[in-house]
């Protein structure tokens, strides 16, 4: 059995937590995040800590409490420090540029690809083959990174495409004559 829910989440100074039934709002210097928790989870806020436990009558109470603890911990980290995700473009002529909240990609198609960023997410391109996504919501950053990667996933023979910076692409050997 996982014991993730047994550990409390420490709320640092400068972070405001509001609990309204199952709706939790966490506000910090990087913005405000809101999440609705499962009915099986009971959250208590006291002494700058959030503690989690199951409600009576739910078989999956501890599992849901562990999930809620992990989600709220990510929210606290997001509003204080924020999250970053790096993407690399590998391939001849593959380029990226950021104009406002639109990421412009040249990925070998006959047309450029423009990807609109959701609210709360910023992107920058230190080089033409690198994209850095920043924001407070870990889930949204991961989804945007997955959407950008989906335009041209790394292919298994030369490894060309959009990849995460920490991703290892396994390449196959070319067919022998």
UniProtKB/Swiss-Prot annotation:
PROSITE patterns named in the record: RIBOSOMAL_L6_1
Pfam family, one: Ribosomal_L6
GO BP terms, alphabetized: cytoplasmic translation
Positions carrying N6-acetyllysine: 44
One Gene Ontology molecular-function label: rRNA binding
Keyword match Ribosomal protein: yes
GO cellular component assignments: cytosolic large ribosomal subunit
Keyword Cytoplasm: no
Keyword line: Acetylation, Ribonucleoprotein, Ribosomal protein, RNA-binding, rRNA-binding
Covalent S-S links between cysteines: none
InterPro entries listed in its UniProt record: Ribosomal_uL6-like, Ribosomal_uL6-like_a/b-dom_sf, Ribosomal_uL6_a/b-dom, Ribosomal_uL6_bac-type, Ribosomal_uL6_CS
Protein task: This protein binds to the 23S rRNA, and is important in its secondary structure. It is located near the subunit interface in the base of the L7/L12 stalk, and near the tRNA binding site of the peptidyltransferase center.
Subunit: Part of the 50S ribosomal subunit.
Family: Belongs to the universal ribosomal protein uL6 family.
Name of the protein in question: Large ribosomal subunit protein uL6
Gene that encodes it: rplF
């Amino acid at each position: 059995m996982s014991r993730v829910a047994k550990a409390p989440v420490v709320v640092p100074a400068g972070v405001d937590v509001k609990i309204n039934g199952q709706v939790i709002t966490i506000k910090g210097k990087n913005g405000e995040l809101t999440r609705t928790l499962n009915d099986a989870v009971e959250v208590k806020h006291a002494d700058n800590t959030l503690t989690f436990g199951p409600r009576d009558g739910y078989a999956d109470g501890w599992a849901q409490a562990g999930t809620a603890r992990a989600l709220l911990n990510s929210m606290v980290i997001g509003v204080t420090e924020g999250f970053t995700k790096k993407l690399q473009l590998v391939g001849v002529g593959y380029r990226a540029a950021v104009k406002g909240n639109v990421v412009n990609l040249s990925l070998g198609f006959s047309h450029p690809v423009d990807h609109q960023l959701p609210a709360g997410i910023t992107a920058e391109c230190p080089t033409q083959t690198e994209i850095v996504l920043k924001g407070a919501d870990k889930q949204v950053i991961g989804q945007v990174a997955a959407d950008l990667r989906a335009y041209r996933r790394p292919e298994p023979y030369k490894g060309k495409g959009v990849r995460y910076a920490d991703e290892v692409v396994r390449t196959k050997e070319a067919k022998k004559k």
